[in-house]
Amino acid sequence: MAVRIEVLKEDNRTRARLGKLHTPHGVIETPVFMPVGTQATVKTMTPEELKDLGAGIILSNTYHLFLRPGHELIREAGGLHAFMHWDGAILTDSGGFQVFSLGDLRKITEEGVEFRSHLDGSKKFLSPEIATQVQMALGSDIVMAFDECTPYPATRDYAKASLERTTRWLKRCQETLTTTDRQALFGIVQGSMYEDLRKQSAAEITELDLPGYAVGGLSVGEPKELMYEVLDYTVPLLPKDKPRYLMGVGSPDALIEGVMRGIDMFDCVLPTRIARNGTALTRYGKLVVRNAESAHDFSPIDPTCDCYTCKNYSRAYLRHLIKADEILGLRLMTIHNLRFLTNLMSEIRAAIKENRLPEYREKFFYEYGYLK
Ligand SMILES: CNc1nc2cc3nc[nH]c(=O)c3cc2[nH]1
């Protein structure tokens, strides 16, 4: 079954859309934040807990699963859904980004990327064909094309050569898939921070009439304002009747700003990663629970939050667990941060529905401390 978006409403003052993403493993309301489960687990969460938190789609990484335990073992297990006991939707990133940011990069050629595994230093090779075959073995619902996430900053010449290779690689991914499986393949627009190159990449990628499109090459160290500027001129180049996915984003403010610019799907490791080192997301900004200020604070992280952690535990207790390296601390902080984000996204969807997204943004940014 094809992956498709049903756009229910287009905001009248911004580019935001309310939608339903139809996948072989369920229908997901958009805009949506996808928790990241890099190694076939959203760290410290059981699938049942993820469902309770409101997650309907998670991200997993081809690079990591290719290196360990290997896609053949997961195929043997009946695919990633069976292997990890998750019956919701799964989107897999293709590995290109992870090779550049994790592996000991050896060489990029037209054929693919040679690299050393970050696990044991052994030589590995990923190509559009291999990355696509791995994702099919995993049985993922949304397959990301194997691309080069153009590093930032990049010269115009490098960015142009890189996007053109990404387009050639996308066509090779498409050719690797059967016609039915092609309905799961999302293309990724590159072009770094050059408007004309983004136009070129978007034109080349959308010509292939894919089920969805990602804006890549962002959240790679550029200032947020520059990311928003690139979105301002890139998102309108993507078809309105297809899902738009901003890769690697993000923080609450970036989620709102991305939705305002027409993005439907987001993923980011930040919320779960900062949770594990004791930082909680709240509507008033970040709360570093491990700091001394919480030592005698017997109130919850956020009294307005409906999560299991905020209903049952104090900041003082969470600070103790984190400082004592207690595993329960990792779990309780993760539960809170994921629930915060699924609540944020449902508030954003309600604001779009009721034509009050700009007002919601103002209120959120003021409370969150972004507007002094
Ligand atoms: C955390 N930031 C971030 N995560 C990304 C993942 C990506 N995957 C494929 N292609 C990308 O361009 C890409 C960009 C990204 N930025």
From Swiss-Prot:
EC code(s) of this entry: 2.4.2.29
Keyword tRNA processing belongs to the record: yes
Annotated residues for binding of substrate: D93, S94, G95, G96, F97, D147, Q190, G217
Molecular function in Gene Ontology: metal ion binding; tRNA-guanosine(34) queuine transglycosylase activity
Region (RNA binding): 248-254, 272-276
Record's catalysed reaction(s): 7-aminomethyl-7-carbaguanine + guanosine(34) in tRNA = 7-aminomethyl-7-carbaguanosine(34) in tRNA + guanine
GO cellular component: cytosol
Protein's pathway: tRNA modification; tRNA-queuosine biosynthesis
Matches recorded under Pfam families: TGT
Biological process terms in GO annotation: queuosine biosynthetic process; tRNA wobble guanine modification; tRNA-guanine transglycosylation
CC cofactor note: Binds 1 zinc ion per subunit.
Catalytic-site annotation from UniProt: D93, D267
Transmembrane segments: none
Binding residues for Zn(2+): C305, C307, C310, H336
Cofactor(s) recorded in Swiss-Prot or TrEMBL: Zn(2+)
Free-text function comment from the UniProt entry: Catalyzes the base-exchange of a guanine (G) residue with the queuine precursor 7-aminomethyl-7-deazaguanine (PreQ1) at position 34 (anticodon wobble position) in tRNAs with GU(N) anticodons (tRNA-Asp, -Asn, -His and -Tyr). Catalysis occurs through a double-displacement mechanism. The nucleophile active site attacks the C1' of nucleotide 34 to detach the guanine base from the RNA, forming a covalent enzyme-RNA intermediate. The proton acceptor active site deprotonates the incoming PreQ1, allowing a nucleophilic attack on the C1' of the ribose to form the product.
Similarity-based family: Belongs to the queuine tRNA-ribosyltransferase family.
PANTHER family named in the record: QUEUINE TRNA-RIBOSYLTRANSFERASE
Self-association and partners: Homodimer. Within each dimer, one monomer is responsible for RNA recognition and catalysis, while the other monomer binds to the replacement base PreQ1.
NCBIfam families: Q_tRNA_tgt (TIGR00430), tgt_general (TIGR00449)
UniProt-recorded name of the protein: Queuine tRNA-ribosyltransferase
Natural source organism: Desulfitobacterium hafniense (strain DSM 10664 / DCB-2)
Chain's gene name: tgt
